A protein has these predicted regions:
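Short metal-binding segments enriched for Cys and/or His
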Residues: 32-46
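Edge beta-strands of extracellular beta-sandwich domains
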Residues: 115-123
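Short amphipathic, basic-aromatic surface patches that mediate peripheral association
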Residues: 63-71
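Exposed aromatic-hydrophobic patches
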Residues: 62-63, 97-104
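Short, aromatic- and glycine-rich surface loops/edge beta-strands on solvent-exposed regions
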Residues: 106-116
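Short cysteine-rich clusters marking metal-coordination/redox-active sites
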Residues: 8-11, 27, 113
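Cysteine-rich micro-motifs
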Residues: 21-32
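Residues immediately within or flanking Cys/His clusters that coordinate Zn2+
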Residues: 5, 24, 110
Length: 123
């Protein structure tokens, strides 16, 4: 079963669900929102789709063909690499980039923009 991400609008908690449908997840007293990813056919892809380069066991991820801004009110919050065995997420503090060392075979990379939502590229 593929990864499903759920988001709390109040506290910004993100939950990864790999089995089940997650339909009963709640946080801060309300149901969590299922995060649906955009793709390369959606407007804004050039600043939001992850660009991935693999070097050995490392994945170098840059968000956007044109680098995404990192402003207080508009930024990439995190990058997530999904693997066949789970995944790894890294917060983006100063730059919309990450060097990740995933355990297992990477199958997709996600980036979350606080203004434009979740973006995904399959590997």
């Amino acid at each position: 079963m593929r990864l499903k991400l759920f988001f709390c609008r109040h506290c910004k908690t993100v939950v990864n669900v790999r089995s089940g449908d997650g339909s009963r997840l709640t946080c801060c007293g309300e149901p969590m929102e299922h995060m649906v990813s955009h793709n390369s056919f959606d407007d804004g892809w050039e600043k939001h789709l992850p660009v991935v380069e693999r070097v050995g066991d490392e994945l170098y991820v840059k968000v956007g063909k044109t680098e995404h801004p990192m402003l207080e009110d508009h930024h990439i919050d995190w990058i997530y690499v999904e693997t066949l065995r789970g995944g790894i997420r890294q917060r983006c503090l100063d730059s919309p980039t990450a060097v990740l060392h995933p355990v297992g075979i990477p199958v997709a990379v996600y980036a979350y923009c606080n203004q434009h939502g979740l973006w995904k590229v399959n590997l």
